[in-house]
Amino acid sequence: FKRDNNLDYAANQIVTSTGAKQSIANVVLCLVNPGEEVLLPIPYWVSYAAQVELAGGTIVEIPTKLENQFKMTAAELDSAITYQTKLLIFSSPCNPTGAVYSREELREIAEVIASYDDLYVIADEIYEHISYGEKHESLAQFDFIKDRVITVNGLSKGFAMTGWRLGYIGAPATIAKACVKMQGQFTSATCSIAQRAAIAALTGTLEPTRKMRDAFLERRNLILELLNDIDGIKTYVPDGAFYVFPDISSYFGKSDGTTTINNANDFCMALLNNAHVATVSGSAFGQEGCFRISYAASTDTIKEAMRRVKAYLGTLA
């Protein structure tokens, strides 16, 4: 936190967990009471909604626009807040869109949050090292709301340590203490072997991470070039993560003679069954009309996958 985000936390403000997903679940279960509202900008990572439901919270979705890279504006956030709102969960860089919030955008969001009492934020920053623009910006950098921000991170994305399962939070001490109690009823401490591996990752050079990021950038540029060559797909330039989230609604109502594409689920199943390319429907992320493609694959695989997608979509009428 100090090296990469210039955030100062005492030891009692840090909690390590079995992956960032558990870190988020701990916070949601500690903060959200039944019936309280949790704001989720659409599209959102699938686990956010499920965890809110487990806590008995009420999900309030905030629609966003492809033209704005699916980023929530401060005005959109402000209009969604009610007296029942307890928590906002958002990610930057974002899964599934790859959207990255700028410092100014985060400041505007922070000012809205500061204007409401007892509103907390989970800032999921798991993809912080896979950002293609300027340096990553953390919401908790703004001191006037730091005591209401829970910053979540982990080792799986920036250090390619998915199987080691280690995530962590920086949070107000009272929330961190509650998360320790909550986690103690599920998994207790994080695997000691994974913690040793994490020390090596966090204290070592970031050069391997930078090389990985540069490789993802090349793949992003490649997949955008290939997607832009397919009629009917509308996309944008994602600034982080390793996903793109195109709009494919122009294909709805079309058929290959056997299957009719009525929604994003149909679209993705048709690609799987006919082109043998696996993607994820936007409905899984709360955003009908789009689908997610991961470019965490070799350039050869990306080229072949996009060739198959283009060929199949060419059969639709």
Enumerate the predicted regions with their spans.
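PLP-dependent class I/II
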Residues: K2-A317
